[in-house]
Amino acid sequence: MIALLPFVLILAAPRARAQGSAPETAPPLFPGGGLISYNSVFTTRGLLPDSSGGIPPTARPTFSHEGDFNITWGFHRNFDLTILVPIVTNRFASAGQPTVGGTGLGDAMLLAKYRFYRRDSQRGTTQASVTFGPKIPTGRTNLTDGNRSLLPASLQPGSGSTDFFIAANWTYTGLFNLKRLVADEDFHSLLRTPGTPATRLGSDIESRFWLSYRPYESKNVAREWFIGPALTWLHSQNDRISGVTQNGSGGDGLLAGVTSYVGLRPGMHVWLGMDWDVAHSTGATFMPVRRHIRFGITQQFRMHLW
């Protein structure tokens, strides 16, 4: 069994989330262990069919970049804590109109993971965990356009709302009795509350399944390589503005792609993943994810707090 790094749960806006800093998402960090990580996520969406009348209040960025910094502490065999702070860049482009957007601090998250199931066998290890915690409104909410008019809440780096994140993760190593084949499922939701200005962004649900194979592993497990296909389902509920539901702003999307992790040395992984839109719903103002690219690096270490 490889020396595992924890899964970093990244989701600060209704976008496809990058699978985290480890090839297996269910295990927590080892007791007394620490981890620092950086994850870079690029997301593009198609243009709205018609936005000649201005920026719709439910518009999503046509391009966004999120750089996530996190630190994780494994304080118990089955528990760990993660603090995540994102830096977000949003851009909105429309035909015949200047591009608007900007960069700012995103909403921070404080997450706790609990592994409630582990079973070892000759085939491999099966593990399951839950993760939960608040998303705190630390993000910037004052981006404006060229006329100094406030951009919609959906284009701001921060939401202005205190939301709740909950996830369930399952990892099954040794699929079909192949010890190098790993099935990994991440199912999570971000439950939204009203934010700024008088906007409640639609809550999000995401299910991501990754089937990875380890074609290379050094004898001392210091270096390894995982690669495999991923399938992601995204669901966004309709936004609400001033108490009025914005029908057609939410929808569903299906992404397919590939993700690869490489262990460079003990405790250090780098990863790269790409996903593309294969199917989506067609709400009046729904802007599905078209392409999703992410890469990152993580390093684990021991923490001596007392």
Which residues make up each language-model segment?
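Outer membrane beta-barrel transmembrane domains
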Residues: 47-57, 197-306
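Sec/Tat signal peptide C-region and signal peptidase I cleavage site
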Residues: 14-18
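Short loop/turn motifs that connect adjacent beta-strands in outer-membrane beta-barrel proteins
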Residues: 24-32, 78, 117-127, 175-181, ...
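Transmembrane beta-barrel strands of outer-membrane/channel proteins
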Residues: 38-44, 83-87, 128-136, 168, ...
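Residue-level signature of outer-membrane beta-barrel architecture
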Residues: 29, 40, 73, 85, ...
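Surface-exposed strand-loop-strand hairpins of Gram-negative outer-membrane beta-barrel proteins
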Residues: 41-66, 154-155, 249
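Hydrophobic, lipid-facing positions within transmembrane beta-strands of outer-membrane proteins
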Residues: 34, 65-69, 106-112, 128, ...
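Outer-membrane pore/translocation modules
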Residues: 90-202
